[in-house]
């Protein structure tokens, strides 16, 4: 509980206080004090109502903060909760193994699937090993390898998107960062097997889009998907980092905006208003959505899978013809 207290967001203070009371009463209940049960139920109800109200009215910038919450579930969590007998694939057969990308095969609801996702890491050591979820070219090449294996063995693909962006270092550029991203997008676009992408946290620019060219693109309600971060946008347009709130609003990067714009196909609700309060519950919601999408896509032929995916992306966007 102390760890979470350090990590809470400003607008979560009231929730944290209620959660601490719930934890204290749970401790007493486990010691045999059954008289606290009614008070415990009342506090749980109060927590749900307060959470629903707080997260329903968040601004775009506040949703970005929730998407970046350090306790938010990562790709590794969704694999743990949803994928059985997961076997990770390592290396890109060219340069090395990028730990910012998890890729491999396992079983989802009894059927084989390929899984690829960004991984930020949880503690300081792992975050450094995972490069804070910012892939190098070898991470994207590893993903491409898994995409092609999935196609060869007729296995559907699931991707989890959660990155501030591809790593912009000199070494990454020298090893072909932009080309690796482009090849990942191209490979996904023409895969002959069904694919579903889920934005679970940050969806930052091309680094995210590399795993986002799927038949179905879903997003958790507090995740975001954008061409640039609010901080980057504020620095470029306003030359002022303090304008992040205005930038977040202007970018229309929230799940609600993206659904209205047709960029994503569905918005997945988060239990208690935010995924970090219930990682397992969030995983179950994601699992139900994945099953629905994969069941729908399984009815398509190989040609239909590719055609529907290409049509989906061709139909995105809007333009106005000047008279």
Swiss-Prot record:
EC number: 2.1.3.15
Major location category of this protein: cytoplasm
GO MF, one example: acetyl-CoA carboxylase activity
Pathway as given in its UniProt record: Lipid metabolism; malonyl-CoA biosynthesis; malonyl-CoA from acetyl-CoA: step 1/1
Subunit composition and interactions: Acetyl-CoA carboxylase is a heterohexamer composed of biotin carboxyl carrier protein (AccB), biotin carboxylase (AccC) and two subunits each of ACCase subunit alpha (AccA) and ACCase subunit beta (AccD).
NCBIfam families: accA, AccA_sub, PRK05724.1
Known function: Component of the acetyl coenzyme A carboxylase (ACC) complex. First, biotin carboxylase catalyzes the carboxylation of biotin on its carrier protein (BCCP) and then the CO(2) group is transferred by the carboxyltransferase to acetyl-CoA to form malonyl-CoA.
Family designation: Belongs to the AccA family.
Protein name (database record): Acetyl-coenzyme A carboxylase carboxyl transferase subunit alpha
Gene: accA
């Amino acid at each position: 509980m102390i760890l979470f207290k350090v990590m809470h967001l400003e607008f979560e203070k009231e929730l944290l206080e209620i959660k601490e009371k719930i934890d204290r009463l749970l401790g007493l209940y486990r010691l045999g004090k059954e008289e606290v049960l009614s008070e415990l139920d009342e506090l749980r109800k109060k927590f749900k109502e307060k959470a629903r109200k707080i997260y329903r009215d968040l601004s775009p910038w506040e949703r970005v903060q929730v998407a970046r919450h350090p306790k938010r579930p990562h790709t590794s969590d969704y694999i743990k909760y949803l994928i059985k007998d997961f076997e990770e694939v390592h290396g890109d057969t060219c340069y090395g193994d990028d730990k910012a990308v998890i890729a491999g095969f396992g079983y989802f609801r009894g059927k084989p699937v390929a899984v690829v996702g960004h991984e930020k890491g949880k503690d300081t050591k792992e975050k450094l090993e995972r490069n804070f979820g910012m892939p190098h070219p070898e991470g994207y090449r590893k993903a491409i390898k898994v995409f092609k294996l999935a196609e060869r063995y007729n296995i559907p693909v699931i991707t989890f998107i959660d990155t501030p962006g591809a790593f912009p270092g000199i070494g990454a550029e020298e090893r072909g960062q932009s080309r690796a991203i482009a090849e990942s997008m191209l490979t996904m676009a023409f895969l002959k097997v069904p694919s579903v992408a889920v934005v679970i946290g940050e969806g930052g620019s091309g680094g995210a889009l590399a795993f986002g060219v799927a038949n179905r693109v879903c997003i958790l309600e507090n995740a975001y998907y954008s061409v640039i971060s609010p901080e980057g946008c504020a620095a470029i347009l306003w030359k002022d980092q303090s304008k992040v709130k205005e930038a977040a609003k202007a970018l229309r990067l929230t799940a609600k905006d993206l659904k209205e714009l047709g960029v994503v196909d569905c918005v997945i609700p988060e239990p208690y208003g935010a995924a970090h309060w219930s990682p397992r519950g969030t995983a179950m919601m994601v699992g139900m959505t994945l099953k629905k999408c994969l069941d729908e896509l399984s009815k398509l032929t190989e040609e239909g899978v590719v055609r529907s995916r290409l049509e989906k992306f061709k139909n995105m966007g809007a333009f106005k013809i000047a008279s």
